[in-house]
C-alpha cells in the first residue's frame, strides 16, 4: 500500500484522495481478493440518510466500518443524490479506516469542499446581549 501513488485533488492547497481512487485500489489489489464492502441504511427517509459501510475479509470478519450522514436539503448535489452521496462517503470512510488513501485526513474531497462552502456561507449571528443577573445569581454573588 505504501508504494501505491493515489491520484489526488487539490482543495485549498491540500491533497485529498477521492473515494473512487480508494475503491479502484481496493478492487485491484490482490491482497483484497474476496473481501467485501457492504452498505446499509439505518436511517433513510425523504429528508436524510445515514449509511454504514462495512468491509469484511474472506472469512467475513469485519475489518473496518465507516458512517456518513447526509441531509437532502443541503447543497446542490444532495437535492437529487443525497442517498448516493451518503453511501459514497461511508464507503470512503471505511476504506480510510483501513488506511487506504490516507495521508493527512480521512475526509473525502467532497466532504472537505462541502465543509468549506458551508463555513463560507454561514449566516452571521449577532451576539446576544449579556443577560441580567437573576435573583439567585445575585444571592450567591455572581
Task: List each model region and its residues.
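Polyanion-binding surfaces on beta-sheet-dominated domains and ring/shell assemblies
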Residues: 1-142
Amino acid at each position: 500500500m505504501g508504494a501505491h501513488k493515489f491520484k489526488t485533488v487539490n482543495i485549498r492547497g491540500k491533497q485529498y484522495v477521492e473515494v473512487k481512487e480508494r475503491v479502484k485500489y481496493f478492487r485491484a489489489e490482490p491482497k483484497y481478493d474476496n473481501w467485501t464492502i457492504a452498505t446499509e441504511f439505518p436511517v433513510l427517509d425523504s429528508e436524510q440518510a445515514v449509511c454504514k459501510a462495512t468491509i469484511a475479509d474472506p472469512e467475513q470478519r469485519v475489518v473496518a466500518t465507516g458512517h456518513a450522514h447526509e441531509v437532502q436539503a443541503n447543497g446542490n448535489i444532495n437535492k437529487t443524490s443525497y442517498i448516493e452521496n451518503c453511501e459514497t462517503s461511508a464507503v470512503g470512510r471505511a476504506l480510510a479506516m483501513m488506511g487506504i488513501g490516507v495521508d493527512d485526513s480521512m475526509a473525502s474531497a467532497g466532504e472537505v469542499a462541502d465543509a468549506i462552502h458551508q463555513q463560507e456561507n454561514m449566516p452571521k449571528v449577532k451576539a446576544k446581549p449579556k443577560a441580567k443577573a437573576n435573583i439567585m445569581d445575585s444571592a450567591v454573588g455572581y
